[in-house]
């Protein structure tokens, strides 16, 4: 079975990319357990709690990330450099994601056969 990586690299609510990626991830999790989820660049904002998407007339899909345990999605990484660049430290993200430096993150991403970016 091929290993599939989902890479979230865009900020939430500015486009449908994050929501569509999350939908694809949850659907794919029904077919395979060989999944990895990566949050890089502005994608780290996908995991911030307390967002108010209704202010920009967007759907609140961020809470759906909390379903990862229910879907047995436990391989999650977040780019430590992206967190530093955006001043995000000591934040309780909506998902438990392991911070990795860029080199280690690329190495981990190299273990996947298919990479889908949202």
UniProtKB/Swiss-Prot annotation:
Keyword set, alphabetical order: Cytoplasm, tRNA processing
Predominant place of localization: cytoplasm
BP terms from Gene Ontology: tRNA processing
Pfam families (alphabetical): DsrE
GO cellular component terms, semicolon-separated: cytoplasm
Localization of this protein: Cytoplasm
Sequence similarity: Belongs to the DsrF/TusC family.
SUBUNIT field: Heterohexamer, formed by a dimer of trimers. The hexameric TusBCD complex contains 2 copies each of TusB, TusC and TusD. The TusBCD complex interacts with TusE.
Functional note: Part of a sulfur-relay system required for 2-thiolation of 5-methylaminomethyl-2-thiouridine (mnm(5)s(2)U) at tRNA wobble positions.
Name of the protein in question: Protein TusC
Protein species of origin: Salmonella arizonae (strain ATCC BAA-731 / CDC346-86 / RSK2980)
Taxonomic path: Bacteria, Pseudomonadati, Pseudomonadota, Gammaproteobacteria, Enterobacterales
Gene behind the chain: tusC
